[in-house]
Amino acid sequence: MSHSLPRLAAPALLLVLAACAGSPQQGAFLSSYEGLAPRTDMVRAGALDRSDPAALAGVTSVRIEPTVFSPRAEAKAWMTPAEQTALLREVDAQLCFELSERFEIAGVNAPPQTPRVRAAVTEVIPTGRAGSAASAAAGFFIPGPIGVRVPGTLGGLGAEAEMLGPQGQQAAAIVWRRTATAIGTDNPSLSRIGDALQFVEPFADAAAAAMTPEDHTARTITAETDPCREFGARFRVEGFGARFITGLYVPEASAARPADTAPETVSAPQP
């Protein structure tokens, strides 16, 4: 009987993860939502995306525009300006990290024909801070990578991104959403945007994948040539250490290096 428990637990965990992925909702940000199709290879997130192979075939460099909040991102109303800035900064950083492994990152003075990547945060579900402390304490007594989150602590993130060609035509797009799971590897946090910050990396990875030509060759990034070094280290050892010691995700030790920038409000896409 005891040998059957792991077999039963795995499908049950998959059901929990699938339920928490959520259905992505259009955030009135993309230049077009036509042709978006569900991603069937994701368990922990829900996503719709599309790619135009012909439009992506010749892309070698991209210009990343600053991330903004979608016009329908009413959820940001509960966030402080500092929280908004930190979240947008993290999206900028992770998109830069992921895209720079695939393309050359062009600066603000890039030629006008350089494809543009634009992204928006469409939903932010707050992480419950009090319950997160209890979750971390409980996790101390539960060995292994799988943790249990207390109800009321589960945050989430919704976001969209697209690549636009020289004439403003959409070459790739994605609508993405994920919420934390009660049972899984999502770390609790004392930050109200802790879960949202953690989910930026998988969003950026999915967005970059949708924008990548099939025959692309991965680029080699060094500390000296890293176009994203303004955001700090790509992997912060201190963040891993903080999670290992406390069981919590600590933004100050894990997220992108802060910058003195204010959060932006989205404007209509320009061709």
PLM region descriptions:
Residues L56-T122:
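N-terminal segment of the mature soluble domain
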Residues G184-P271:
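Compositionally biased, intrinsically disordered linkers/stalks adjacent to structured regions
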